[in-house]
């Protein structure tokens, strides 16, 4: 970790091209807001991280503080100091070096940032060789030093042929930035203070400016929802490739979605169209086709197909079949084969849950818990009206509605007694409808 470096993340923009009331940096990639992705990379190299906000400052700040409470938050004075350099004017600079990056670059890695921080120069900028440089500021390099960044509209024919372009991240020696920042003005068409002007000013003051060549994909900026989808696919591909190399078997991996916070242990199998959402931990388990797992722990179990495990469930040594939904359930050694809702429940080993079983956990005002002991047989089409406790070694007859606790060893049955009325079909429909 480099504690001599401060990192400033710029996240004050409106993000109008996202066409949403939601702040751009709170749009999620692989389950987490893009600002959180870049903060994770920043904190991998330093403890001194600041974020500059403006639009929806409180909302973004709240999300940041939930995960990184030590982050310093500053608000940009957009009325008086718009632009990328204007954002930095309100930040208390610290650290021997100041690294500036953007909150809408969620694919940037800590190794990329370290390369900028470790380069020996007064001003370090990031650049990449663009296959199609149209629209980018061209980086003019002479004798290994950056002389200028020339915008597309201002570039000569010779400069337009240059493929080295500005990637948008910078690292300054603090003393150099303190010299340069007051000299950046807003004498341009947009009347904004641009950090790109720092290169020209640094050269005028005889400071050393260099460029570090970076991976274009890692420095991709997100400006609209199409670019968001591209970035998410890049991140998904990387997550899945790493997991498969670590031993996770995936059927049709291109159809699978995995949250960036999910963890896998041992040998696991994910079939097609599976979604793993939130902070899941999955150990030695099979997740079958079209199942959704949310923020739960799955161990030594097979889930699905077409099952839904909702948040805060803990499932071990258990079979969950098709069209079974579990919410806040703790299941250990259980079989629930099909068509059941198991919410707010604890079910112990050896218990079989019949088709169509429902734990009725909500009375319209509050949620209640169902507890089922060991070696219980729950017949099909059973409703368990919580709060209710089922002891060990119990049989619950099919079609029962259980509203009271059941003691160990008992048969619980709650349904009308069957009565067969001979000849009723003919009496009801008539002789002509009786088929021989």
Swiss-Prot record:
Binds 1 Mg(2+) ion per subunit. Acetyl-CoA binds at residues 361-362, 380, 398, 415. It is found in: Cytoplasm. Residues 247-436 are annotated as: N-acetyltransferase. GO terms for biological process: cell morphogenesis; cell wall organization; lipid A biosynthetic process; peptidoglycan biosynthetic process; regulation of cell shape; UDP-N-acetylglucosamine biosynthetic process. One of its GO terms (molecular function) is magnesium ion binding. The keyword Cell cycle does not apply. Residues 1-225 are annotated as: Pyrophosphorylase. This is Bifunctional protein GlmU. It comes from Campylobacter concisus (strain 13826).
